[in-house]
Design a protein with these regions (language model features):
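Active-site acidic/histidine proton-transfer and metal-coordination neighborhood
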Residues: 77-169
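N-terminal pre-domain/capping segments
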Residues: 1-93, 261-263
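Histidine-acidic metal/acid-base catalytic patches
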Residues: 2-7, 23-26, 104, 154-171, ...
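A structural motif
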Residues: 32, 98, 103, 141, ...
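Charged helix-capping and loop-helix junction motifs
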Residues: 49-54, 83-91, 121-129, 182-189, ...
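Hydrophobic faces of well-ordered beta-strands that scaffold small-molecule active sites
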Residues: 8-16, 35-37, 65-69, 106-108, ...
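Acidic-and-aromatic substrate-binding clefts and catalytic sites of carbohydrate-active enzymes
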Residues: 15-25, 39-52, 75-77, 114-118, ...
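Alpha-helix-loop-beta-strand connector modules within alpha/beta enzyme cores
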Residues: 55-72, 126-139, 220-226
């Protein structure tokens, strides 16, 4: 049963771009925002010296609360040993980076193929759970948050959560849930106790548009009720494009008092 207690205002995060770091830093200071660093987990930042200045900026900011781990083509449960090994190396590198930058959470995408269940799903959940729990033990103090990405329903993440402990939780992406075809209530009902953070963006129900909050088809009043029903404060990341998207999203949330944000 969901709680009816009112949650306090959450810790809000954005995903800055180092190429516009000064603007992002001013926005973060003005709005008391933290960072979920994304770009360090994407090429060309994954290798070589290209990331040095970027890493130093994030480290010196004192605002990194989370890292979005490597996710492009990453599948730590791949049936191909070479792909599996590289995926796991990238995940471990993301955790090392998180420790370096002072993050508390690392977000990884769920890698389950959405149209296969049965033995495939059981094997995927077994392999991922063993690996993620190994990482959680190795990087104590970090919470690994597995995000619904191409998932059509909560079943893969539910299977994974049954095999893991407190160090491995769920990042519920509201936008991804919206275009999945499964009602948002089901995502909260099934995964609620395991949710450790939220990703917020809007879309029209077909693609991952990353629209400003309020510009798409998501029922944000319902999303707010479901969040409040969890009875716990969760960090939230605004994945809404550039500065204007963040400003517009914050104004919408505050105007409506959603997620305990006040104008």
């Amino acid at each position: 049963m969901m709680s009816t207690d009112h949650c306090p205002a959450p810790l809000l995060r954005i995903q800055p771009q180092f190429s516009h770091y000064a603007q992002r830093a001013r926005l973060a200071q003005r709005e008391s925002l933290f960072y979920e660093a994304l770009e360090l987990s994407m090429a060309p930042m994954l290798d070589g010296n290209a990331a040095a200045a970027c890493r130093e900026w994030y480290k010196s900011s004192g605002r990194v609360n989370a890292i979005h781990g490597a996710f492009i083509d990453v599948n730590p449960a791949s049936g191909d040993p070479a792909f599996r090994e590289l995926s796991r190396r990238r995940c471990r590198e993301s955790c090392t980076l998180a420790v370096e930058l002072g993050a508390e959470q690392v977000v990884f995408h769920s890698s389950a193929f959405p149209f296969l269940r049965g033995g495939y799903l059981e094997n995927w959940a077994d392999l991922c759970a063993a690996f993620y729990m190994e990482l959680a033990e190795e990087y104590r103090g970090l919470t690994l948050c597995i995000e619904n990405s191409q998932d059509l329903d909560p079943e893969p993440l539910e299977a994974l959560m049954k095999r893991t402990g407190d160090g491995v939780r769920v990042c519920l992406d509201i936008g991804h849930a919206h275009y999945s075809g499964t009602p948002l209530e089901a995502w909260f009902d099934v995964l609620g106790p395991s949710i450790a953070c939220l990703h917020l963006s809007d879309n029209m129900g077909r693609f991952d548009d990353h629209l400003p909050i309020g510009d798409g088809g998501i029922d944000w009043a319902m999303a707010d009720r479901l969040y409040q029903g969890l009875g716990k404060e969760l960090p939230m990341t605004l994945e809404v494009g550039g500065l204007q998207g963040v400003d517009k999203s914050l104004a919408f949330l505050r105007r409506n008092g959603y997620f305990a944000l006040e104008g």
